[in-house]
Amino acid sequence: MAESNADVYASFGVNNAVMTGSTPTEHEQNMLSLDVAARDGDDAIVLSDEPTSHNDDPYAAGVDPFADGEDDEGRIQVRISEDGNEAGFDTDGDNSEVETEGEDVEFEPLGDTPEELSQVTEQLGQHEEGFQAMVEQAVERGLSADSVSRIYEEYEADGISEKSYAELEAAGYSRAFVDSYISGQEALVDQYVNQVVAFAGGQERFSAIHTHLEATNPAAAESLESAMMNRDLATVKAIINLAGESYTKKFGKPANRSVTKRATPVKPVARQKEGFTNQAEMIKAMSDPRYRSDSAYRQMVEQKVIDSSF
């Protein structure tokens, strides 16, 4: 029995379901006459109008095409604009505050005393000597020793009393003259304190160091205050340097520690205090070249300054 055309096509995997004619030529003509989308076995191709504008931003629709739709674990999606700058960010999940560590604090040892500080210190001393000379001259004019003691106490405290004003005026010093003199002295004191604070690194740094001393070494804090009142700049600098180093160790850069070593607490040992016997010995130690170049020597000297009792 001769094979039909259908049998021939069937041997190549073609059945009657896809044949629209009795011959291949007739089938091709019938298929070409159909609408493109209706051709059997073809994929439908749909053409759309050209968009009026083109946007390369895959996030323009407000949806992250790369995000996992089921991810709800508080991830952050950041959008970058075409010019490379961050355009905005969206956060999912609960808002949480992120704590960051502050910048490392490292104290730089104080160097040479600024010329401005030295000058105002000298002016302050001269001004006080002038006040003492004025009081001594008032004594020669009849001011009593008790009045002199009282005036000094008032001068160092809250100001001259009315009684002292009257006694000074009787000795030849008017109220306006006394007030002017005291105002000048107070201005110099303010200038002196501001210069010391600036020398220490500014108000914030000075306050931090002073507070640190009050908490860890109250005696050193009192020594610093006393040295400032006495205009002892060498002692002021030594105490601030020592306190600054201690402050850095406590609040500054963390010490590098090998991960292979276990931190073992060391049993504290009481330190034996050894101060300078007099100011001349202290100045000699600070004049040593090692004070500027050897940190261990400088720390030893500064510690002896704090331990000194003179």
From Swiss-Prot:
This is Capsid assembly scaffolding protein. InterPro entries: Gp9-like. Residues 46-102 are annotated as: Disordered. It holds the Pfam family Phage_T7_Capsid. The keyword Electron transport does not apply. It comes from the Viruses. The gene is 9. GO terms for biological process: viral capsid assembly. Belongs to the T7likevirus capsid assembly scaffolding protein family. Residues 83-102 have a biased composition (Acidic residues). Scaffolding protein involved in the icosahedric procapsid assembly. Coassembles with the capsid proteins to form the procapsid, in which the scaffolding protein is found within the external shell of icosahedrally arranged capsid protein subunits. In a subsequent step the scaffolding protein molecules are released from the procapsid. Facilitates assembly by binding to gp10 hexamers but not the pentamers and locking them into a morphogenically correct conformation. Keywords: Viral capsid assembly, Viral release from host cell.
